């Protein structure tokens, strides 16, 4: 969305796009001017899980002349809304943090990194991180927030320790919500801006003992596999004899 001057003599608007940080804007579409104060464009040819994108909107007058927009940080055009940058959230499992935080050595972790949203006139008030576990619905409340007013230089990353979720199937999904501040003449964007949904799976861990002693001494009485992050879907456990016959089988 982009707010425009509905009194300007404009024929249409050029939509320009560049991939993350390469500053190579190319035209991807046009938006006809119909006299409203807001224009909309949907970019369907993107890979939001691989890249974040930058956009610029250029007005084109009735003579076909594209009107150059001002630099993004030009103080004379402080209320310009013709530039935008999306959020890319990336995740990675079990990074080696031994040199940074040895307490994480024995933990299962998901590391999340994302870039700044740009650019709202009211700037970003805060970022909110939401999580889904085991393909369940996302949390209604964020599991973490980043306050960009009181701590604007806080790094945009998060280490999610997921060791306690080992009984699940190991599937985790995340997304970021950006909230606009109130210092804007047009009012903050009520719906915010969202990143891609980034999903990741922890590596299944299975340990199967080779003996057990059901002799009543309360040690190793039960033979069963010990699992972490193993899905119950299509699970089966079968014990075979040396000759290949099935001794025991279960889906529990």
Describe these PLM feature segments:
Residues 1-8, 49, 63-123, 183-216:
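Pro/Thr/Ser/Gly-rich low-complexity, intrinsically disordered linker/stalk tracts
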Residues 8-10, 122-124, 230-234:
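Short proline/glycine-enriched turn/loop motifs at strand-loop junctions of beta-rich domains
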Residues 11-49, 126-168:
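Recognizes extended acidic, P/S/T-rich segments that occur
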Residues 12-14, 56, 99, 111, ...:
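Conserved beta-strand and immediately adjacent loop positions that scaffold enzyme active sites
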Residues 19-23, 61-63, 118, 133-137, ...:
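Solvent-exposed strand-loop boundary residues in beta-sheet-rich modules
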Residues 41-67, 160-188:
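Beta-strand-rich modules
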Residues 54, 130, 159, 172-177, ...:
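Exposed, low-structure sequence patches enriched in small/polar residues
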Residues 97-98, 195-252:
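Short loop/turn motifs at secondary-structure boundaries
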């Amino acid at each position: 969305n982009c707010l425009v001057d509905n009194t300007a003599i404009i024929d249409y608007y050029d939509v320009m796009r560049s991939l993350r940080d390469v500053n190579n804007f190319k035209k991807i579409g046009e938006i006809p001017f119909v006299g409203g104060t807001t224009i909309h464009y949907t970019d369907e040819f993107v890979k939001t899980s691989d890249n974040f994108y930058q956009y610029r909107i250029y007005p084109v007058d009735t003579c076909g002349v594209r009107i150059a927009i001002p630099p993004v940080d030009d103080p004379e055009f402080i209320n310009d809304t013709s530039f935008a940058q999306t959020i890319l959230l990336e995740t990675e499992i079990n990074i080696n943090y031994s040199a940074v935080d040895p307490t994480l050595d024995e933990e299962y972790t998901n590391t999340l990194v994302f870039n700044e949203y740009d650019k709202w006139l009211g700037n970003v008030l805060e970022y909110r991180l939401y999580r889904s576990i085991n393909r369940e619905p996302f949390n209604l409340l964020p599991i973490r927030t980043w306050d960009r007013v009181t701590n604007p230089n806080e790094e945009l990353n998060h280490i999610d320790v997921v060791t306690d979720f080992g009984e699940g199937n190991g599937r985790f999904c995340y997304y970021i919500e950006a909230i606009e501040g109130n210092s804007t003449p047009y009012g903050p964007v009520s719906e915010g801006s969202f990143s891609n949904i980034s999903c990741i799976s922890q590596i299944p861990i299975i340990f199967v003992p080779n003996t057990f002693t059901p002799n009543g001494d309360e040690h190793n009485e039960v033979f069963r596999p010990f699992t972490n992050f193993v899905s119950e879907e299509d699970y089966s456990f079968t014990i075979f004899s040396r000759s290949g016959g099935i001794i025991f089988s279960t889906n529990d």
